[in-house]
């Protein structure tokens, strides 16, 4: 005759609790994209850049451009690292193609 083992695992009696662990995801760091004032880039080009690469209205672009002109620097927008890096590169590339010394940088928000 077959022997039966008493107790232990696998006898089908008992209960178990399964807890679902939700991973904690961090929000990505945000970066401010800044335009720096210079004495050579035309104001209209700065407005163009703000409209083209930052989707600003003419009114918002003009307001930001005047802020940059008066204060030396202005925030164009706040983005994740990759987006901010791309926008900085687009602005600098466009400025170079149009032969303007416009500078654009990013800093952690």
From Swiss-Prot:
The record's listing under SUPFAM superfamilies reads:
ClpS-like
Please give one Pfam family short name: ClpS
Q: Which InterPro entries match?
A: ClpS, ClpS_core, Ribosomal_bL12_C/ClpS-like
Q: Which terms does the UniProt entry file under GO BP?
A: protein catabolic process; proteolysis
- Give the highest taxon in the source lineage: Bacteria
Which stretches does the entry tag as region Disordered?
1-20
Family membership noted in the UniProt record: Belongs to the ClpS family.
Assembly description = Binds to the N-terminal domain of the chaperone ClpA.
Instruction: Summarize the protein's role.
Output: Involved in the modulation of the specificity of the ClpAP-mediated ATP-dependent protein degradation.
Instruction: Please give the name of this protein.
Output: ATP-dependent Clp protease adapter protein ClpS
Q: What species is given as this protein's source?
A: Caulobacter vibrioides (strain NA1000 / CB15N)
């Amino acid at each position: 005759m077959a022997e039966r083992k008493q107790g232990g695992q696998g006898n089908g009696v008992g209960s178990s609790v399964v807890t679902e662990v939700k991973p904690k995801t961090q929000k990505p760091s945000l970066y401010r994209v800044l335009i720096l004032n210079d004495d050579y880039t035309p104001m209209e080009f700065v407005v163009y850049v703000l409209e083209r690469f930052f989707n600003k209205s003419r009114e918002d672009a003009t307001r930001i451009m005047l802020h940059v002109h008066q204060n030396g620097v202005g925030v164009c927008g706040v983005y994740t690292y990759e987006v901010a890096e791309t926008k900085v590169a687009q602005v600098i590339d466009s400025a170079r193609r149009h032969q303007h010394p416009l500078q654009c940088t990013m800093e952690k928000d």
